[in-house]
Curated annotation (Swiss-Prot):
Protein name per the record: Large ribosomal subunit protein uL4
Alphabetized Pfam families for the sequence: Ribosomal_L4
InterPro entries linked: Ribosomal_uL4, Ribosomal_uL4-like, Ribosomal_uL4_dom_sf
SUPFAM superfamilies according to UniProt: Ribosomal protein L4 (SSF52166)
Biased composition (Basic residues): 54-65
Length: 200
């Protein structure tokens, strides 16, 4: 299949990488797995056994007329432990390489199908100035965009750093969440070739 390139000749690309069916279930699984992997999982609360004190029973079992109580750190007491206390846990989910690659191919194919993938021969800025990058993006009518190149250009990275709706990644640093989070994905021809190598 062919991909149109801005101000250049169309390029031939792999049908497998850029022309497959959109598998929503698989993409959802990949996104959830990626985001779960970013969770810290260090939340911890104290149960009745973790809270300091509460060893001696507050009053005897019978004869006071009050409800029986064995510890002042019971979850129903003020200052007591938490009933179902959170514990540190690993939220990461396993996703096979084959499934991850298939999800990435599915996302790229959907970007092509919905005209959200903008392919350019090359994209760079001469100086690390946000103003220069903004001018270039405005000329292409791009406001909310992920820029993917073969390797991250330092000037481009510095110029985009202060723009809230612009991100710069290399092919290796691209992930399912970043690819679907932006209105458009601006990608260089060399990055397209690298995606074909990695996902083909």
């Amino acid at each position: 299949m062919q991909l149109n390139v801005n101000d250049a000749q169309a390029i031939e690309v792999s049908e497998l990488t850029f022309g497959g069916e959109f598998n929503e279930t698989l993409v959802h699984q990949a996104v959830v797995a990626y985001m779960a992997g970013g969770r810290q999982g260090s939340k911890q609360q104290k149960t009745r056994s973790d809270v300091r004190g509460g060893g001696k029973r507050p009053w005897r079992q019978k004869g006071t007329g009050r409800a029986r109580a064995g510890t002042i750190r019971s979850p129903i007491w003020r200052g007591g432990g938490t009933t179902f206390a959170a514990r540190p846990q690993d939220h990461s989910q396993k996703l096979n390489k084959k499934m991850y690659r298939a999800a990435m191919r599915s996302i790229l194919a959907e970007l092509v199908r919905t005209d959200r993938l903008v392919v350019v021969q090359d994209f760079a800025v001469e100086t690390p100035k946000t103003k220069d990058l903004l001018g270039k993006l405005n000329n292409m009518s791009l406001t909310d965009v992920l820029i993917v190149s073969d390797a991250v250009d330092q000037n481009l990275y510095l110029a985009a750093r202060n723009l809230p709706h612009v991100d710069v990644r290399d092919v290796q640093g691209s992930d399912p969440v970043s690819l679907i989070a932006y209105d458009k994905v601006l990608i260089t021809v060399s990055a397209v070739k690298k995606f074909e190598e990695l996902l083909g």
